[in-house]
Amino acid sequence: MATDEHATPTGTGTTETAIHGTVAPGFEAVRDAFAGNFATQGDVGASVAITVGGDLVVDLWGGTATFDGPDDDEAGVPGVEGDWQEDTIINVWSTTKTMAALCCLMLADRGELDLYEPIATYWPEFAANGKETVATRHVLSHTAGLSGWDEPLTMFDLLDHDKLVTLHAAQAPWWEPGTKSGYHAISQGYLLGEIVKRIDGRSLGTFFAEEVAGPLGADFHIGTPASCDSRVARVIPPPSPLGEEGADHDSIAYRTLANPALTADFSWRKDWRRAEIPAAGGHGNARSVALCHTPTACGGTAHGVTLLSEDGVARIFDQQIEGPDLILPLELNMGMGFGLPGPMLPVPNPRTCFWGGWGGSLAIIDVDAQISFSYVMNRMGEGTTGDLRGAGLLLAAYGAMMA
């Protein structure tokens, strides 16, 4: 692969955005689509990476990491300034969920966690208030009925794992578990994190660092250390905040998204970075996301690292729910922790799974083609689980594979 310094006009048409990195022969269309995101889709700083059969065939980055938003003198950490670099990382929001799911799948593969067993087997207090039969599979598929909290919360409560899991252990489900999906936008991570901790003894972030990121050499963090601060870019908030403004305040959607009403700039805080928020607080770039999922794409093993057996990979595709979601205005087709092919993921291969993050980040695993794909950016769009920028890059990648 050759280093690429291809320059393409940005969305303003007045400056040029240099695209850096490498592309394997035949994947030049991905580079062109990536440059096009800056030219026509308003990208500011971003990265895209693809592995095929374990080989890194696309590893591109470009734009600027600078965002001149205000700093919080007490708790804020200035974002990195200047060009988006090879090692720039950023909060990827719900793309983090794919890492949390991977940790649970690994424990299931080792026989330590039964995804169909009641959570109360591992976490006895969780059985309270009618949750005796709620299983980990329900949390992974957003069907547990615990998409939010009864008690009013602030954004600072999101930094307190123990408080949030204690509240959920005592709370009744908002709907009959297993019957419908309702996107557990923030809550999923705390629930999975507590399950992992009860079984393994380590926090989910520590488990991930020691069992996934460390062995693979992947620069992805759930609980980002201060040593990374000089490389962390700040997200550029979307035009509209996350939430259901004007919606029925008694609706499940409003109760989920407005308690608390999370704003993107809260992720600029150092206490957010340090906290383990497994549904929304992971920091990485496209290369690290793609690398973390490369073993799964290759049947469980890549680069000498085995994360899952073939049966463990197959467990992802155990469909749990398909139909309209109670929170997102979408039809969800959910397996174990990942979305499956359907309206949200129109791809050619059936053993493909995905999830994306608020504002546009995206992770795709195609086991049939052994593809691991990721797109990560700083300028957030309106979407909650990815957007057209990542989709366009994915289409270019499949086009290259089929050429």
Describe the function of each predicted region.
Residues 2-73, 87, 180, 197-215, ...:
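Catalytic loop of the DD-peptidase/beta-lactamase superfamily, centered on the K-T-G motif
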Residues 27, 61, 83-84, 98, ...:
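Tryptophan-centric aromatic hotspots in well-structured domains and transmembrane helices
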Residues 81-82, 86, 91-95, 99, ...:
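Active-site helix/loop module of the DD-peptidase/beta-lactamase fold
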Residues 171-178:
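Cytochrome P450 catalytic-domain "roof"
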Residues 179-185:
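Cytochrome P450
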